[in-house]
């Protein structure tokens, strides 16, 4: 009797059956969660086996998750691959998690992409959230704030930040007018990024920063390779097999981080050769001094080899966020000329044309400030914070969230929530002005969520806000921006860690008055 007669299944059928069995076992294991009695897991839609909700997220996860939050509430759960992800929406819920329960939500998930950022030692992206991380964060924040508000005795500017921005903004005005005399138009982002990088570079390295370096310009002009890949929900972070398949974007991301780190390592090393602890005038020097006075890692201390990692975080965040904010601002201004006229009128009335705007003018320019706030809210160019992670089992809004659960914070939803904003999809700076139009409504402005909250809140938020204000004030005092008649400006954002505006090659600038 043939052996095959004794077996009810063929080898192929047995293999298929075994595969299905293990697939079902894997899915059941992936979805299984031990929830304490009396508690419940966050709700959410049923996802596909193996891939979860990847297809649901699509190209614009912030929009997809906003739609899901309207159905499932401010605390919902999805899966990317087999990884469960909790998504938080709603300002009150996010404040509860990141501020009132900050110790529970201060972690970072151990994502594959983060291992390439500053050799895996980034203070911003690294999953470490212990005492050493907290001490280094305090140190970086202190150095950043010190050298943004400190002043050079030889300068007429109120602080180093004002001095650097004023100089770079004037250079940018000249550059834009030169482009108008030549090509006759320009693309804003590519012109702005170098000027903004020079500001944060000068803050970090003082006179040692190579402002005209081709290497530096090439790096900052390709920063989109970083922001597009480091976005929340990147499949490479959740599907390990994708790391071994041909992936041009992953390779570009690796190359960018390698070049950026090498550039900063070289700049830090060169700067250290000229370091004088009795003459500290920039962030790197302050970190050098701290390292030499406290060479052993203990509490607030930092070894010198880690300085480049802190500078990497400060420099990287410093130029990308500000560049994106100014780029969006200019595109909104050319599409809404009536708003630009109001800003010009306010600048002329408060500052005139005989002096430059200064940081001290900010309270006297409420419409300008309201415009910037509306740019932040409407564009929400940081749609999510960098993903958080729970550091222990916790309960939020009655839902059980276990330790080490990846958490997305949907800032875009908060900034377009009809419960918080009247006509959220209308660009209207006036919403932020008090009834007499002489001041900004701080209660309303505090509802904008762009820089995160709690123990992971962006350390450069204040610096970034000041920088955006001063750049725009100087540019708009001297220039009027427009596009040629008939040119339509695309305002559809390109999703990423920071959402960039589409390239618009047709922006024009003309001087408002003769110097």
From Swiss-Prot:
Residue positions binding substrate: 226
EC number: 1.14.14.1, 4.2.1.152
Pathway(s) of this molecule: Cofactor metabolism; retinol metabolism; Steroid metabolism; cholesterol metabolism; Lipid metabolism; arachidonate metabolism
Glycosylation sites noted in the Swiss-Prot or TrEMBL record: 69
Gene Ontology MF terms in the entry: estrogen 16-alpha-hydroxylase activity; estrogen 2-hydroxylase activity; heme binding; hydroperoxy icosatetraenoate dehydratase activity; iron ion binding; steroid 17-alpha-monooxygenase activity
Domain of life: Eukaryota
Record-level GO cellular component terms: endoplasmic reticulum membrane
Stored PANTHER family: CYTOCHROME P450 1A, STEROID 17-ALPHA-HYDROXYLASE/17,20 LYASE
Functional summary from the UniProt entry: A cytochrome P450 monooxygenase involved in the metabolism of various endogenous substrates, including fatty acids, steroid hormones and vitamins. Mechanistically, uses molecular oxygen inserting one oxygen atom into a substrate, and reducing the second into a water molecule, with two electrons provided by NADPH via cytochrome P450 reductase (NADPH--hemoprotein reductase). Catalyzes the hydroxylation of carbon-hydrogen bonds. Exhibits high catalytic activity for the formation of hydroxyestrogens from estrone (E1) and 17beta-estradiol (E2), namely 2-hydroxy E1 and E2.
Assembly behavior: Interacts with PGRMC1; the interaction requires PGRMC1 homodimerization.
Name under which the protein is recorded: Cytochrome P450 1A2
Origin species: Cavia porcellus
């Amino acid at each position: 009797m043939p052996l095959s007669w004794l077996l009810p299944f063929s080898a192929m059928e047995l293999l298929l059956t075994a595969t299905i069995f293990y697939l079902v076992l894997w899915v059941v294991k992936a979805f299984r969660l031990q929830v304490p009695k009396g508690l419940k897991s966050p709700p959410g839609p049923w996802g596909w086996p193996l891939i979860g909700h990847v297809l649901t997220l699509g190209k614009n996860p912030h929009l997809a998750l906003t739609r899901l939050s309207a159905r499932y509430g401010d605390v919902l759960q999805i899966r990317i691959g087999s990884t469960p992800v909790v998504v938080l929406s709603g300002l009150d819920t996010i404040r509860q998690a990141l501020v009132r329960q900050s110790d529970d939500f201060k972690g970072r998930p151990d994502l594959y992409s983060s291992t390439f950022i500053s050799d895996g030692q980034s203070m911003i992206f690294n999953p470490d959230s212990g005492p050493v991380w907290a001490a280094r964060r305090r140190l970086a924040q202190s150095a950043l704030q010190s050298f943004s508000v400190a002043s050079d005795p030889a300068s007429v500017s109120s602080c180093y930040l004002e001095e650097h921005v004023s100089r770079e903004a004037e250079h940018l005005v000249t550059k834009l007018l030169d482009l108008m005399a030549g090509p006759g138009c320009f693309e804003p982002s590519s012109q702005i990024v170098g000027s903004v990088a020079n500001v944060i570079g000068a803050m970090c390295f003082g006179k040692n920063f190579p402002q005209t370096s081709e290497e530096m310009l090439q790096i900052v002009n390709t920063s989109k390779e970083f922001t597009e890949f480091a976005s929340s929900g990147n499949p490479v972070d959740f599907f390990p097999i994708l790391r071994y398949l041909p992936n041009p974007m992953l390779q570009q991301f690796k190359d960018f981080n390698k070049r950026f780190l090498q550039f900063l390592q070289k700049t830090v090393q060169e700067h250290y050769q000229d370091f004088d602890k009795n003459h500290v005038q920039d962030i790197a020097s302050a970190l050098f001094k701290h390292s030499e006075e406290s060479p052993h890692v203990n509490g607030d201390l930092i070894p010198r080899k880690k300085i480049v990692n802190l500078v990497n975080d400060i420099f990287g965040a410093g130029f990308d966020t500000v560049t994106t904010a100014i780029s969006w601002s200019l595109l909104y201004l050319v599409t809404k000329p009536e708003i630009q006229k109001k800003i010009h009128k306010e600048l002329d009335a408060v500052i005139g044309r005989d002096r430059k705007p200064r940081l001290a003018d900010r309270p006297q320019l409420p419409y300008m400030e309201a415009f910037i706030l509306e740019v932040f809210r409407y564009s929400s160019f940081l749609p999510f914070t960098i993903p958080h992670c729970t550091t222990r089992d916790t309960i939020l809004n009655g839902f059980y969230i276990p330790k080490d659960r990846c958490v997305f914070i949907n800032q875009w939803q908060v900034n377009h929530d009809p419960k918080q904003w009247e006509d959220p999809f209308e660009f209207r700076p006036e919403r932020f002005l008090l009834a007499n139009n002489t001041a900004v409504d701080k209660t309303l402005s505090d509802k904008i969520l762009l820089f995160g909250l709690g123990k992971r809140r962006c350390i450069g938020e204040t610096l970034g806000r000041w920088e955006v204000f001063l750049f725009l004030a100087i540019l708009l005092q001297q220039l009027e921006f427009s596009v040629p008649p008939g040119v339509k400006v695309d305002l559809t954002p390109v999703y990423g860690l920071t959402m960039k505006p589409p390239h618009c090659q047709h922006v024009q600038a003309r001087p408002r008055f003769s110097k």
